[in-house]
Amino acid sequence: MGAAFFYAGAMDVFTKTVSRPDQAGAEAAGLRWLAQALAAVVVDVTEVTSSSLSTRRVEQARPSAPAARAFGAALRTVHEAGAPAFGAPPAGWEGANFIGRVEQPCEPCESWGEFYAEQRVLPFVDGLPQGVQGIVRQACEAIKAADWDVKPARIHGDLWAGNVLFTADSAVMIDPAAHGGHPWTDLAMLELFGTPFYEEILRGYGAPKEYEKWVPMHQLHPLAVHAMTHGPAYYAPLEQAARSTLEALR
């Protein structure tokens, strides 16, 4: 989201600028929506303008197993606060939705499979090589055709390690792309780019054994975004995740 800097004389506040007016508003709305579920694990918004977002500085600490377990339990509490629908934006927010600097759809949908395929994966694959596109589209069709026994969760939506700031006794989330989604999507993104004490987060969360089977499917979204924005280095991982998804759905 654009350049970041501290305001002079306000070292307890972190302020970053944004390139589009809706970016700051979307992030602030997402943070406040997540905080309604459990404020202790969400960075506190102090000010939002059309060009910037200010949040209270987090007292960070070295990651630890107990903090990771506590964060996992807290993340489950946030998820269980729920959302009106899959693809539902943060409460009261009517503007655009972003993952990082990239705009993405966020329209309420009754079906998780339909939402995930059409709004979180397919929008990012049009410019990719035909072979990659083909297998990803096959996976998306299979996802849409499957029955999913899951209720809309209140998810962060961009929960990689850089958006988790460990504290002495837990962790705090920043920079969300919050929406109504599948709770395992947050967990799978934590795994994708490597998060300290990831297994302890899962333990604290209480992730079921079958979760691991579906990790590649839940990583299709961030991999598709990175394939679009970062190029060929992500083509093979995206293709493999799509193949693993098809295998899991057989």
Regions found by a protein language model. Give the residues of each.
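Short, low-complexity, intrinsically disordered N-terminal peptides in bacterial proteins
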Residues: 1-12, 247-250
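Short helix/strand-capping connector loops at secondary-structure junctions
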Residues: 217-226
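ATP-binding pocket architecture of kinase catalytic cores
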Residues: 4, 11-114
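Short strand-connecting beta-turns/loops that link adjacent beta-strands
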Residues: 50, 168-170, 220
